[in-house]
Every structure is written in structure tokens, then in C-alpha cells.
Amino acid sequence: MRYNTELFRKHGITTLVTSCPICLKVFREDYALDGIEVLHHSEYMLRLQQAGRLSLRRGATRFAYHDPCELGRGSGIYDAPRAVIEAVGELLEPEHTRENALCCGSSVANTAITDGQQVRIARSVAGELEATGAEVVVTACPLCKKALGRGTATAVRDLAEVVAERLK
């Protein structure tokens, strides 16, 4: 941690953006990063969009959003990903959402369950997301993307991928 902190300071880093909710929590809670703002990429993309620095094309695509455990319940970030999705298409919510969202079976549980159990959990969660009628499942966590991708034939994208596809 000391090495990373010194590296950030040496290079004058004032904002640190991560796509991983677990990394977000670690940088925010375990590092002494006074003067360095730590953001999840959903927060950063929304900030850029609101400042007029990120122009997106809205389409008719229907997106179902999966709340990552560590991003939502762990860090309280629910609205930023949804606002970004709503800028590019229709947001559909599964039955279990926000603080009641189902775990994809990855993350910390990945060390405590078998691969087969993880896939069964992912299929169950993916089934709920598919039931929304969405064309694309969106999440904001690389572990969730990987897990959900193993549980469905529906396209699964990270929020950043969706944004990249919709840049003006």
C-alpha cells in the first residue's frame, strides 16, 4: 500500500478511477489517500456526462442492470450506473435490485464455493435479469461480468463497454 500511495503522490494523481468495486473499497477504506479522490468508473462517467465532456447517443436498446454487491451494498453506489444507462437506452430493473440485488456468485464467495455452485448461482441471477426482456445485461464489476456471462447467452457488458459503443 505504501508503494502505491507514494507512486500516486509522486505523479501528482488527484483522482483515481477504478472499474472494480472491491478495489474501490480498498482504496477508499484501507489507503491513506488524503487529497486523492477515489471514484468508481460509473461515478466518473456520470460526472463527465453531466459536465458535457462525454456525449452519448441514445438508442432503443433495453438494458437490465445488475447491482454488484460491493458497489451497491458495499459502497452505496446505486444511482450513477443507472443514470449512465438511461442516457443510452431503456433501463429495466430485475425483481431484486439495489440493496436487495442477488449476488452473482463471484467476488469473495468465489473462494468459498465450488465452480459448479458459482455457475448455478450465476444462472439463477441471469435468469432474473433475462426475465426483464432486456437485450443486454449491464453490470459495473468485472467479476460480475465474468460470472453472469457464464450463466446466460444474453449479451453481458460492463457499463464502460456500453458507453464506448454509444460515444458520439
Model-assigned labels for residue ranges:
Residues 1-168:
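Iron-sulfur cluster-binding electron-transfer modules in prokaryotic oxidoreductases
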